[in-house]
UniProtKB/Swiss-Prot annotation:
Protein's organism: Talaromyces stipitatus (strain ATCC 10500 / CBS 375.48 / QM 6759 / NRRL 1006) (Penicillium stipitatum)
The family this protein is said to belong to: Belongs to the GatB/GatE family. GatB subfamily.
Gene3D superfamilies: 1.10.10.410
EC numbers for this chain: 6.3.5.-
Top-level enzyme category: ligase
NCBIfam families found in the cross-reference section: gatB, PRK05477.1-2
Record-given protein name: Glutamyl-tRNA(Gln) amidotransferase subunit B, mitochondrial
A GO molecular-function descriptor: glutaminyl-tRNA synthase (glutamine-hydrolyzing) activity
UniProt-listed InterPro entries: Asn/Gln-tRNA_amidoTrfase_suB/E (IPR017959), Asn/Gln-tRNA_Trfase_suB/E_cat (IPR006075), Asn/Gln_amidotransferase (IPR018027), Asn/Gln_tRNA_amidoTrase-B-like (IPR003789), GatB (IPR004413), GatB_Yqey_C_2 (IPR023168), Gln-tRNA_amidoTrfase_suB_CS (IPR017958), Gln_synth/guanido_kin_cat_dom (IPR014746)
Length: 595
C-alpha cells in the first residue's frame, strides 16, 4: 500500500510502541553466516530432488485416490447420518498486504532472495527489541471491518512460548488475551457452496481477530537437512477465529473460501491459499445426537465432543477432505468404545486419514504472558470510520449488482466474474460493458437490456476459452476492452455472424493489431445478408434432400433437428452471408407450415 495514503491517518491513530534500543543493519555481513541455519534430521529416506508443482501433485493424488476406490482399497467412509453431530471451528492465518514487517523495519517480500530481508529482531539477536510498524494495522483493520468485527480501542500483545527451528526467539508475539477486533460474523449463502442441509443461508460468528507474526519458511533438502529462510519471520499475520458453529465439511470449506474472497476484495492480503498466503486450522469434534451433552467446551460453547485440531490446511479441498476424514475417524473410535484424544493432527494431499502430530498444547503449555517490550495499541475511532467509509465493494455486494437490472447476469456468470483472477476479470468485463453502453447510447432501453449478458458470455466463455487453450494466465492487454467491445458491437448490429466474430477474436488474440473495422473490411468478413428469396431457395434444397428428417420434425415434433438444418445452411451458403437466426426463422416457416 502506498505510504502517502496511510501517512494521513497515523497522527490520529495514536499508536504507541517502545522504540528500538539498538540500530538495525539489514544484511550485515558479519551476521550472514547466522542467517541460514541447517537443521539435521533423522530421515534416511531418499526423496527426489525435483520439486513437484502443487497442481501436478493434486492431479496425481486425485488419480491415485480414484484408482484405490476402483480397486476396493479406498477408505470406507463412515456415514455422518442423523446419529452423529459434527462441530467445526476454524482458525485462519492470513499474510497481510504490507510493505513492512510487524515488528521490524525490514521489508516484506515473498520472492526476494532467501534471508535478504532480515532485521536483527527477526533473528532474536540479544538486545534487539520489537518496533511496531503502524502501517501494518491498516490492512488488518480493513479485514476486521469487512468481517463485521468490533474494533477494540485498546489491544495488547502477548508472547506465546514454544520452541521450533522456524521461531528463533522461542516465542511468537500474538494477541491472545486482548485482540484488536472481536465479535464479527460472516454470512454464507447457498451460492457460496454451503451444504444442502444448511439451507439457503447460515451465519458463522467470529470470536476474534488478532495480529501476530509469521515464522520462518522451511525448505526441505533431502535426505537429512532443512534450510530456513528468515525473510518470512515477523511478516504480519491476522488470525481469524470462528466460533464452533459449522456442522458440515462443505460449509467449512465455503467459509474459508468466502473469508479469502473478502480479504482479497479489501486488499487486506495479496495472495490466497493457492500461493501460501492463507492457511487454515480446523477443530473437529463429534457427538451422538441422542446422547447427553458432551464434556467438551470450546470458546464458551458447551456440550460438545472432544475436539482435535488439524493444522496447516492449504486448499479449500483439503479443508473439506480433512474434516471428513477426521469426522469418520472419531466416529469409528467412539463406536468401538474408545476415547477421542486431545491432540494435534496433520493431513496430506491425497490422504485418506489424518495422522497424529503431537498431543495438543493448551494455555498452560504455551505460557502466554504480556510482552514487556510492547506498549498497548490504541486505535482511534476516527481512523476506523475513515476506513469504513472507503471500504471497497465486497463480493456479496458485487454479486447483487451483477445480477441486478443494470447488468442482468445469471448467478452462474456473476460468480466467476467476481472470483476469477483476483478481480481482474470483473474489472475487464466492466470496461467492455461501459464501452458497449457508450456505443449503444442512442438505443432504446429494451435494446440495451442484453448488453451485460452478451459481454459476460464473450469475456467468460469465448475469451476465457482462448486463454485456457493457450495455457496462459489472464491478461487484459491481450485483447483490449475497447477492441472486444467493438467486435461485440459488430455482432449485435448484425454486421458479422457469430462464427466470424469468433474467428476475428482468435486473430486478435494471436496478435493481429488491425482495428476491428479495418480487419473485417480487409478480410472481407462483413455480412452481406441474403434476401428472403435466397434464404428460401437454400432452405428448400436442404428440405428436399432430407425428407426423413423433415417428417420426424413434423410428425414427431423433434424440433431440435431444425438446428441441424441451420448448421447446413450456414456451411453451404456463401461465407459470411447466412445469419443463423434468420435461417432458423425461414426453416420453421417452411417445415412447420400447414399444407
Amino acid at each position: 500500500m502506498p505510504r502517502l495514503w496511510y501517512s494521513r491517518y497515523l497522527a490520529s491513530a495514536r499508536l504507541r510502541c517502545r522504540p528500538l534500543l539498538i540500530s538495525e543493519q539489514y544484511g550485515a555481513r558479519i551476521y550472514q553466516h547466522l542467517l541460514r541455519r541447517t537443521i539435521n534430521t533423522e530421515a534416511n529416506v531418499q526423496r527426489p530432488n525435483d520439486i513437484v508443482p502443487l497442481r501436478k501433485q493434486l492431479k496425481e493424488e486425485a488419480k491415485r485416490s480414484k484408482s484405490q476406490s476402483r480397486n476396493g482399497r479406498g477408505k470406507k467412509q463412515v456415514a455422518a447420518n442423523n446419529e452423529w453431530e459434527l462441530t467445526v471451528g476454524i482458525e485462519i492465518h492470513a499474510q497481510l498486504n504490507s510493505e513492512a514487517k510487524l515488528f521490524s523495519r525490514a521489508p516484506t517480500s515473498t520472492v526476494a532472495e532467501p534471508n535478504s530481508n532480515v532485521a536483527l529482531f527477526d533473528l532474536a539477536f540479544p538486545g534487539s527489541q520489537p518496533e511496531f510498524q503502524a502501517a501494518t494495522l491498516l490492512p488488518a483493520l480493513r479485514a476486521a471491518i469487512a468481517l463485521n468485527c468490533e474494533v477494540q480501542h485498546t489491544s495488547r500483545f502477548d508472547r506465546k512460548h514454544y520452541f521450533y527451528q522456524d521461531q528463533p526467539a522461542g516465542y511468537q508475539i500474538t494477541q491472545y488475551y486482548e485482540p484488536f477486533a472481536r465479535n464479527g460474523f460472516i454470512k454464507l449463502y447457498d451460492y457460496d457452496g454451503i451444504a444442502p442441509e444448511d439451507g439457503k443461508f447460515v451465519r458463522i460468528d467470529i470470536k476474534q481477530m488478532q495480529l501476530e507474526q509469521d515464522t520462518a519458511k522451511s525448505h526441505e533438502h533431502p535426505p537429512s537437512a532443512h534450510f530456513l529462510d528468515f525473510n518470512r519471520v515477523s511478516h504480519p499475520l491476522i488470525e481469524i477465529i470462528t466460533m464452533p458453529q459449522i456442522h458440515s465439511p462443505a460449509t467449512a470449506a465455503a467459509c474459508v473460501r468466502k473469508i479469502q474472497a473478502i480479504l482479497q476484495a479489501t486488499s487486506a492480503v495479496t495472495t490466497g491459499m493457492e500461493l501460501g498466503g492463507l492457511r487454515a486450522d480446523v477443530n473437529v469434534s463429534v457427538r451422538r445426537r441422542d446422547a447427553p451433552p458432551g464434556a467438551g467446551e470450546y470458546y464458551g460453547v458447551r456440550g460438545l465432543g472432544q475436539r482435535t485440531e488439524i493444522k496447516n490446511l492449504s486448499s479449500f479441498k483439503a479443508v473439506e477432505d480433512a474434516i471428513i476424514a477426521e469426522r469418520d475417524r472419531q466416529i469409528r473410535v467412539l463406536e468401538s468404545g474408545g476415547t477421542v484424544e486431545v491432540e494435534t493432527r496433520g493431513w496430506s494431499i491425497g490422504s485418506t486419514e489424518t495422522r497424529k502430530l503431537r498431543s495438543k498444547e493448551g494455555e498452560v503449555d504455551y505460557r502466554y504472558m504480556p510482552d514487556p517490550d510492547l506498549h498497548p495499541l490504541f486505535i482511534d475511532d476516527g481512523l476506523v470510520s475513515t476506513l469504513k467509509e472507503n471500504l471497497p465493494t465486497l463480493p456479496d455486494q458485487l454479486l447483487a449488482m451483477l445480477v441486478g437490472p443494470m447488468y442482468g447476469l445469471s448467478l452462474e456468470d456473476a460468480k466467476p466474474l467476481v472470483e476469477l483472477d483476483d478481480g481482474a476479470r470483473l474489472e475487464y468485463y466492466q470496461d467492455v460493458f461501459d464501452v458497449l453502453q457508450a456505443l449503444h447510447s442512442d438505443d432504446r432501453d429494451a435494446a440495451k437490456k442484453g448488453l451485460g449478458r452478451t459481454a459476460a458470455n464473450w469475456v467468460l466463455h469465448e475469451l476465457g476459452a482462448l486463454h485456457t487453450k493457450a495455457e496462459v494466465a489472464w491478461h487484459a492487454d491481450r485483447i483490449p476492452a475497447q477492441t472486444l467491445a467493438e467486435l461485440i458491437d459488430q455482432l449485435i448490429r448484425k454486421k458479422i455472424t457469430s462464427s466470424v466474430a469468433k474467428q476475428v477474436l482468435v486473430m486478435v488474440f494471436e496478435g493481429d493489431q488491425r482495428p476491428i473495422q479495418q480487419l473485417l473490411e480487409e478480410e472481407n468478413l462483413l455480412l452481406r445478408p441474403l434476401c428472403r428469396e435466397e434464404y428460401i431457395a437454400l432452405a428448400n434444397s436442404l428440405i428436399e434432400e432430407n425428407p426423413q428428417m423433415v417428417a420426424q420434425i413434423r410428425e414427431k415434433n423433434q424440433l431440435g433437428k431444425i438446428g441441424w438444418f441451420v448448421g447446413q445452411m450456414v456451411r453451404q451458403g456463401e461465407k459470411g452471408r447466412v445469419e443463423a437466426q434468420r435461417a432458423e426463422e425461414i426453416l420453421r416457416e417452411l417445415i412447420l407450415k400447414r399444407n
